[in-house]
Amino acid sequence: MRSCLWRCRHLSQGVQWSLLLAVLVFFLFALPSFIKEPQTKPSRHQRTENIKERSLQSLAKPKSQAPTRARRTTIYAEPVPENNALNTQTQPKAHTTGDRGKEANQAPPEEQDKVPHTAQRAAWKSPEKEKTMVNTLSPRGQDAGMASGRTEAQSWKSQDTKTTQGNGGQTRKLTASRTVSEKHQGKAATTAKTLIPKSQHRMLAPTGAVSTRTRQKGVTTAVIPPKEKKPQATPPPAPFQSPTTQRNQRLKAANFKSEPRWDFEEKYSFEIGGLQTTCPDSVKIKASKSLWLQKLFLPNLTLFLDSRHFNQSEWDRLEHFAPPFGFMELNYSLVQKVVTRFPPVPQQQLLLASLPAGSLRCITCAVVGNGGILNNSHMGQEIDSHDYVFRLSGALIKGYEQDVGTRTSFYGFTAFSLTQSLLILGNRGFKNVPLGKDVRYLHFLEGTRDYEWLEALLMNQTVMSKNLFWFRHRPQEAFREALHMDRYLLLHPDFLRYMKNRFLRSKTLDGAHWRIYRPTTGALLLLTALQLCDQVSAYGFITEGHERFSDHYYDTSWKRLIFYINHDFKLEREVWKRLHDEGIIRLYQRPGPGTAKAKN
């Protein structure tokens, strides 16, 4: 190297400058091949590929962050009245992310088209700069931290709700909202749905669609305070669906070993400013004075389900309860299609509304069951002497007028009980429901087949449901084509759950057969009469000594009453006796040791 430098010194100055210039030119052309500037402006194709790759990574990430608990449970509730004294331990097991993570699946119909676009735009922009929000799990949650992707929240504590509660008429605020991140970074945000823990005492409005930073009509957004870190879980994300699409993941009865008891179990829908009785001897007055009944009886419940009482928040709340006490496992689009066809009931207290203003008259009602105790009872004239007469299911009158009377004001039924009665008793004269311009129909909605029956009724089509395979007729035939919708009433699931929780909570609900239990149709009808009437007399219901009588008053031969597991006849017998002893109802009880013989 030194020899080369020594030789270069002997060259002329012009040659040396020429060599130096050549070396510089060489380096100028060779340098870019060694140092390449990173490409900061990718092509459209490269950008798309990068976004897809990052999206897949963000979707896979929550799975690794999910808690390792054996069972992950959540609770979601819309604003409803607060819990009362009958609330028991909470033991829900599953509320899957697919169910509550799909805001679009439960968005109002008019916003269905907007939801996928909004959500897609939020998920595809600058995923590396997303700031996600977290939701709370149960008190046994995992370590606090931030989780990416769509998350869903739960809170075992009951939230504040600004509605009327139970007997106390207290007001509280239970809130559920769908939230967005507090700041948009890179114009991106992920959405989440959360139940605010009781400790935060926030008043957030529920929304019906996916929330974004831009305020939309009818949509309220809120931010989870960043200072409070709560235990969290990151459930796997779910695709957007519309409310009319059946969801893959949802609350299922099979996931519960006994009836789930939610912290909003005792929150019901109430009628504010309803009519009040002026009868001094009314059931409602007696109930308020009874040490036993004053803790159970709620006089201002919403009794009927109609288009005014069906919305997204009600669906979300009632989906936690199995039919007939809620909407669990039902088809949203079917229920919506049916219920929204029923006009609002002007007054829940139908019978009080029929009285002149200021009237002190007491409304008397007879509720006629189908028990064999009425055979040869000669109670027909007494039954007809009441202001209103309630009947149910196979209300066979022809040939039994002396025992059961002839008048009908209310007819209660389920799709199953009505179609079975038409099938079994059709050849004995029960070819249609009781008819008359003043007859009102009370439909107790047991489950899917009842909504399928109603759909066929409203469309005037033949019932094709496999759940009613024995009835291939148009439901309107049972009403002789003279049905008026203002006289066809659907009983509200809240009202039926109130009956079950406060009067007829069977031990069956605490076991494996909880799903099939419900009070008898007669029991539901009798407790409905307690809400509508001032004075109630019950005929044909189970009493002590029921073994002496046939199953039904219209049986042509003696049949033993069978205690099926889906009903609790012993419990009902005890409740009717207690109501009778308290002077709330007058229960017809047949004296004497003899067995009543069936008519031929």
From Swiss-Prot:
One of its GO terms (cellular component) is Golgi membrane. The chain crosses the membrane at residues 15-35. Residues 38-191, 208-248 are annotated as: Disordered. Glycosylated; autosialylated. Keywords: Disease variant, Disulfide bond, Glycoprotein, Glycosyltransferase, Golgi apparatus, Membrane, Signal-anchor, Transferase, Transmembrane, Transmembrane helix. Residues 84-94, 151-179, 209-219 have a biased composition (Polar residues). Residues 46-55 have a biased composition (Basic and acidic residues). InterPro entries: Glyco_trans_29 (IPR001675), GT29-like_sf (IPR038578). This is Alpha-N-acetylgalactosaminide alpha-2,6-sialyltransferase 1. It comes from Homo sapiens (Human).
